[in-house]
């Protein structure tokens, strides 16, 4: 499973360089997600909002018609609820892309838990640029902080030594960001995609003719990491004997999970998955499983309530 990424530092002025990194003047602040191009994401998001390539598109008609070109704003972003923060450096990148001279101070560490009313970011710069970037920046930080906040709720509810995992149930195109947000909430990443581990599920088992046969096919193909999903206790030993390196226990109740953990006996990691809720995760984790995976972290997280207010300078 992937480890927690480095987080941007506190109280930094940020901008976006040509490599998609967040920077503070001449000092580079690491914000690199393998496989994710920050500069491309920011540009594509702004292009979508501005209607680049569409008839009549390519501009913010409201700001251009109402706000003087040389007007400057001060901006203040704050939390309206208690949240776990994720995505502030990405939000900052939207503003600096449109106004490279914008002064931005990120006040809170990524992954920090903050109460309602906490100042998150301060900005000073071109008013049109702020207004044009506002929605893209807020959408991103609200979405990612919402995921981080829900994830932290599940981590806190576990009350055990088990580790919370996310899943591949992410919005297309946003997987790297959403999985980053779950890490900021205290979870670890499950597979990033179809490429980094085999996960044998019921359809694979049906075609192969059984759990052992499916695992053996993956082993023969040279796959090193083989996660095998089982939904019955009597499938576990067959999966282990065939060489599974991780057993996923699908939709089992706590009694079945305890039995499965005893049978696996620490030979490989065990994972409980399926139908996990805040009210049930403590009992599930108490069975001794290594991991508990929850699709709702990225499927069902509500946006965090984060506001951004501007004042003319």
Predicted regions located by residue number:
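Acidic/glycine-rich phosphate/pyrophosphate-binding loops and surrounding catalytic core
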Residues: 25-242, 252, 258-263, 269-271, ...
């Amino acid at each position: 499973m992937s480890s927690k990424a480095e987080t941007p530092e506190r109280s930094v002025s940020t901008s976006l360089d040509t490599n998609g990194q967040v920077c503070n003047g001449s000092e580079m602040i690491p914000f690199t997600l393998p496989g994710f191009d920050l500069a491309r994401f920011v540009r594509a998001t702004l292009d979508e909002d501005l209607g680049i390539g569409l008839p009549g598109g390519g501009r913010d008609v409201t700001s251009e018609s109402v706000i003087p070109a040389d007007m400057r704003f001060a901006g203040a972003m704050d939390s309206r609820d208690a949240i776990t923060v994720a995505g502030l450096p990405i939000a900052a990148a939207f503003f600096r892309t449109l106004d490279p001279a914008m002064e931005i101070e990120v006040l809170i560490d990524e992954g920090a838990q903050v109460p309602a009313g906490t100042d998150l970011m301060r900005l000073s710069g071109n008013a049109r640029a702020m207004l044009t970037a506002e929605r893209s920046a807020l959408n991103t930080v609200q979405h990612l902080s919402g995921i981080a906040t829900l994830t932290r709720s599940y981590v806190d509810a576990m009350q055990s030594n088990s580790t919370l995992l996310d899943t591949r149930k992410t919005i297309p195109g946003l997987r790297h960001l959403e999985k980053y947000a779950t890490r900021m909430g205290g979870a670890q990443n499950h597979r990033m995609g179809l490429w980094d581990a085999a996960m044998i599920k019921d359809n694979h088992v049906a075609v192969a003719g059984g759990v052992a046969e499916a695992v053996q096919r993956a082993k023969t193909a040279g796959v090193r990491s083989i996660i095998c999903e089982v939904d019955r206790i009597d499938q576990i030993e067959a999966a282990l004997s065939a060489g599974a390196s991780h057993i996923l226990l699908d939709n089992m109740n706590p009694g079945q999970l305890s039995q499965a953990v005893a049978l696996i006996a620490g030979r490989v990691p065990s994972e409980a998955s399926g139908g996990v809720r805040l009210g049930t995760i403590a009992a599930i984790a108490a069975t001794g499983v290594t991991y508990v995976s929850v699709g709702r972290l990225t499927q069902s997280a509500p946006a965090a309530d984060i506001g951004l207010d501007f004042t003319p300078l």
